[in-house]
Amino acid sequence: MSPATVLDSILEGVRADVAAREALISLSEIKAAAAAAPPPLDVMAALREPGIGVIAEVKRASPSAGSLATIADPAKLARAYEDGGARIISVLTEERRFHGSLDDLDAVRAAVSIPVLRKDFVVQPYQIHEARAHGADMLLLIVAALEQSALVSMLDRTESLGMTALVEVHTEEEADRALRAGAKVIGVNARDLATLEVDRDCFARIAPGLPSNVIRIAESGVRGTGDLLAYAGAGADAVLVGEGLVKSGDPRAAVADLVTAGTHPSCPKPAR
């Protein structure tokens, strides 16, 4: 039996936490709450705006870096991101390793008028309805965390609720699985969730193999405008940035710098 990876350990905790939440609020109750929520915003329209989009993340901690920032007011941070020009706000809701919560998602959804992404490790259909009930417009699905049949059903369920799935991959094989499942938005994570090692060339290897009608998002490794431009040159439509923003002294200005670079006439445009 192979030793457990970092991802395996995270998923074990997530399953336990989902079971605990479902014991308090049943699947039928969370489905009803999702159905009663305001309709989701148009994520695809936001991602297709001109230039390289910035998805700015509310992120307190990570397994690789530990504690990143004390975020006493996630709503205030999200508003700063929106004021800086972010197209989408990503909210970590995993509790054990990332110190996030559904309360953070609620606070951010109430604070901004742009789409919100729930970033978590989705392993149960319950979490999809939960995301919608708490106002998410977009939901992360990690290929490495799901068998193919589960990936297909999770993607279908996400879209059936009107949300957009961000399907995350780290290898060419995972990208192929994402495409076979019907992914319309694929995020290439430079970080291997099994080992936490970062491969900054990962996006440049995988993106050329993706069809032109698929939205391509570069995740991890964006430390500034130089990284954004490099990802743009490799075909990115958007970048997802967390650590670099929460550790900056001025998150609004940090987002604005990235947005300016991503919309500058000299910024490479994705081939379409």
UniProtKB/Swiss-Prot annotation:
Example of a GO biological process term: L-tryptophan biosynthetic process
InterPro entries named in the record: Aldolase_TIM, Indole-3-glycerol_P_synth, Indole-3-glycerol_P_synth_dom, Indole-3-GlycerolPSynthase_CS, RibuloseP-bd_barrel
Cited CDD domains: IGPS
Keyword Lyase recorded: yes
Example GO molecular function: indole-3-glycerol-phosphate synthase activity
PROSITE patterns (alphabetical): IGPS (PS00614)
Catalytic activity: 1-(2-carboxyphenylamino)-1-deoxy-D-ribulose 5-phosphate + H(+) = (1S,2R)-1-C-(indol-3-yl)glycerol 3-phosphate + CO2 + H2O
Pfam families per the UniProt record, alphabetical: IGPS
Keywords: Amino-acid biosynthesis, Aromatic amino acid biosynthesis, Decarboxylase, Lyase, Tryptophan biosynthesis
EC number per UniProt: 4.1.1.48
Top-rank EC class of the record's enzyme: lyase
Family: Belongs to the TrpC family.
NCBIfam families: PRK00278.1-1, PRK00278.2-4
Protein's name in the database: Indole-3-glycerol phosphate synthase
Organism per entry: Mycolicibacterium paratuberculosis (strain ATCC BAA-968 / K-10)
Organism lineage: Bacteria, Bacillati, Actinomycetota, Actinomycetes, Mycobacteriales
